[in-house]
Amino acid sequence: MWKLIKGLNHVGVAVSNLDEALKTFKTTLGLEPCYVKEVRDQKIRVASFKVGESTLELFEPTDPSSTVAGFLAKRGEGMHHIALAVDDIRATLDAAQKAGATVIDREPRVGAEGQLIAFLHPKSTRGTLIELCQE
């Protein structure tokens, strides 16, 4: 399956207050977001930063019933997921399932940047939530 992974797409960090986090990342690290927008179907507001060849996403829940709100309640702020770039998300999902991974999204959906995404359950990946992003 490793041949299906192209590289790192981004790292996602869950925050309780995106506006405060934006201030922190600007004053502490000098980072300015490329965009800030709401992703309604995921019930989040997200800010994306280009950091060299990589991307960092900060996101807050917009609904207390969202999975991100649940994550924050259980674990607090911090790294939420690692996103890996793939050419063919469906082939990667099929290979992951055949290898025994539990997929969260049986069908890919559209992510914050308009590309197809799907998640692998952290119980299948040694405690790390993996997002697959078709580039």
Enumerate the language-model features and the residues they cover:
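Short glycine/proline-centered loop/turn elements that form peptide/ligand docking sites
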Residues: 20, 38-42
